[in-house]
């Protein structure tokens, strides 16, 4: 692969002034956007191995704003790409690749990085560098924002200098699918109207308005939804007025109606909602005092509770705050009652500290469920908390430090972390959904039988026999109870294995002329020595082929499995 760029790429007067970023990524397609200083044909070549670029998508007209649709892809596959500039010049190297989304409903593990309020300056750059230090060479599937993507007006120049030129340094924009949220500062110099066509935010991002990636069509790029694996993501605009001249917290707005219908329609295991204004905060804003936040809290959390949303990501307040699972709290902080509004009391940190077991959610029994609210408004901006901080719904609160929020979903497990500018984890929590631990069970096996046992959860394991894998194979010779737990003893399962008495040793004369439908012979170490898959008879001729010593014979007779142990001599 030819590698020909540093920052911006110039070839014969043609210059890539905005490096590629990924939009509308799904199971079978992705849109690659980039910008050049001169109008040229848009052309992207794609490879499945990074060596042979045998697929080309190009435009028929020249452009400076390039949007290339790559389709007919396969879910959960890695693809390399490069941008053609001239007949022999390309922008691209081995770091230019993406991975298509897993099939909807897939339990495949994926990762998400999120930031909010990216005020320009050293903090913003340090937050990104801290995340790169934390993540190392691991791939990040999705990149979400919580609004206020730029400051100083929200112009295209602001986006170019303080968004694209920051996050194009490293793998993120060229590898991870970007799904942003709009914040109040993105609207600064524009009418406060959703989908305003001249607004830089809406010009720079291509977002799913027609349900192309799952979810219901919103007919707006200000709010939308998409599916990724087993998770349904919803982005809202918590600031501007819609085409109905209403904001989402003004009453029965178009956006609120769409939100309810979209949540009602999804069948995904996990539900994640992200937007700018926080319903609960005691940071640089106070959700007890700001009218918009009060109005928003009176409406949105009720919807999230009704439709069992799992995680809500917000910004605006320039602190980091994270609640325990929260339920049925829509009033002032003084009205919060932990006995009523916290269905689970753990910190959720799952780090072996006191009272830190994971949160347990269920799709069938929702009484103990709640919504975890995260305020992540420190992607560049920071500030002091209110004098009465922390907000009582919060499990963890931090002011004066910039950072970002990262989470992974692996089947029925969600792990989340707040990462500071140095790449250190300051807060974390884990949620299991529909864990369904096995009740203690009893099973009877024959003396020679082998058995495979498996723990239910995804994570770490401590078995009573010393094993540390999820699945273990055992061959007990006496009644044994096998127990498994996680290292923190938050989960336990037990398997009571009853073992039939060992077979008595039979002489060869007692073991001849026994018909079988199939037969397998083992030595005493459990190694298979012979196998017969067709009807036959245990007789002198068959036994004469065995080495002298003890043998275990497992055979089918009249549809039943039988076994015996024999001793052979030279026959």
Give, region by region, the residue ranges found by the protein language model.
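Acidic, histidine-bearing metal-coordination/catalytic regions of metal-dependent phosphoesterases
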Residues: 13-114, 119, 133-137, 271, ...
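Residue-level detector of functionally pivotal "anchor" positions at catalytic/ligand-binding pockets or at interdomain
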Residues: 434-442, 490-518, 523, 569-571
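Solvent-exposed loop segments of extracellular immunoglobulin-like
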Residues: 456-462
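Short, glycine-anchored, charge-dense loop/turn motifs used at functional sites
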Residues: 521-529, 551
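Extended active-site neighborhood of metal-dependent phosphoesterases/phosphodiesterases
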Residues: 78-93, 97, 156-267, 286-294, ...
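A short beta-strand segment in extracellular, disulfide-stabilized domains
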Residues: 31-33, 448-456, 512
């Amino acid at each position: 692969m030819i590698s020909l760029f540093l920052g911006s790429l110039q070839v014969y007067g043609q210059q890539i002034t905005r490096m590629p970023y990924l939009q509308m990524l799904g199971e079978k397609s992705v849109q690659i956007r980039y910008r050049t200083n001169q109008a040229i044909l848009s052309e992207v070549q794609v490879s499945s191995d990074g060596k042979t670029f045998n697929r080309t998508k190009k435009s028929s007209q020249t452009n400076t704003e390039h949007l290339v649709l790559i389709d007919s892809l396969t879910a959960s596959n890695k693809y390399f790409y490069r941008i053609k500039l001239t007949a022999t010049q390309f922008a691209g190297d081995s770091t230019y690749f993406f991975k298509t989304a897993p099939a909807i409903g897939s339990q495949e593990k994926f990762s998400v990085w999120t930031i909010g309020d990216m005020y320009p300056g050293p903090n913003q750059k340090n937050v990104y560098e801290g995340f790169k230090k934390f993540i190392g060479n691991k791939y990040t599937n999705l990149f979400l924002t919580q609004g206020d993507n730029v400051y100083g007006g929200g112009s295209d120049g602001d986006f170019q200098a303080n968004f694209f030129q920051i996050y194009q340094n490293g793998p993120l924009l060229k590898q991870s699918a970007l799904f942003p949220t709009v914040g109040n500062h993105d609207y600064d110099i524009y009418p406060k109207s959703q989908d305003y066509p001249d607004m830089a935010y809406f010009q720079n991002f291509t977002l799913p308005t027609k349900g192309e990636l799952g979810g219901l069509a919103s007919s707006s790029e200000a709010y939308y939804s998409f599916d990724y694996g087993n998770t349904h993501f919803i982005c809202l605009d918590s600031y501007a007025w819609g085409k109905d001249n209403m904001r989402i917290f003004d009453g029965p707005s178009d956006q609120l109606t769409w939100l309810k219908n979209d949540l009602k329609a999804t069948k995904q295991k996990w539900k994640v909602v992200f937007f700018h204004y926080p319903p609960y905060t005691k940071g640089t804003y106070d959700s007890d005092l700001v009218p918009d936040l009060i109005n928003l809290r009176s409406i949105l959390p009720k919807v999230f509770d009704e439709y069992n949303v799992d995680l809500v990501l917000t910004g605006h307040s320039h602190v980091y705050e994270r609640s325990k699972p929260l339920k049925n709290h829509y009033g002032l902080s003084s009205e919060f009652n932990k006995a009523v509004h916290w269905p689970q009391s753990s910190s959720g940190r799952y780090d072996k500290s006191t009272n830190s077991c994971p949160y347990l959610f269920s799709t069938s029994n929702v009484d103990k469920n709640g919504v975890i609210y995260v305020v992540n408004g420190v992607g560049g901006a920071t500030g002091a908390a209110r004098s009465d901080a922390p907000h009582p719904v919060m499990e963890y609160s931090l002011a004066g430090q910039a950072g970002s929020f990262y989470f992974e979903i692996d089947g029925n497990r969600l792990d989340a972390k707040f990462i500071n500018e140095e790449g250190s984890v300051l807060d974390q929590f884990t949620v299991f959904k529909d864990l369904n631990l096995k009740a203690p069970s009893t099973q009877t096996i024959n003396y020679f039988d082998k058995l495979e046992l498996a723990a239910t959860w995804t994570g770490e394991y401590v078995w009573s026999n010393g094993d540390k894998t999820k699945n273990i194979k055992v061959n007990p010779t006496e009644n044994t109870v096998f127990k498994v737990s996680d290292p923190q003893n938050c989960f336990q399962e037990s398997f009571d294995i009853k073992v039939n008495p060992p077979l008595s040793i039979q002489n060869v004369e007692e073991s001849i002329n026994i018909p079988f439908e199939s037969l397998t012979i083992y030595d005493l170490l459990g190694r298979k020595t012979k196998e017969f898959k067709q009807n036959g008879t245990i007789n002198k001729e068959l036994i004469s082929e065995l080495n002298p010593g003890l043998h275990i014979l497992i055979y089918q007779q009249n549809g039943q499995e039988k076994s015996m142990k024999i001793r052979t001599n030279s026959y």
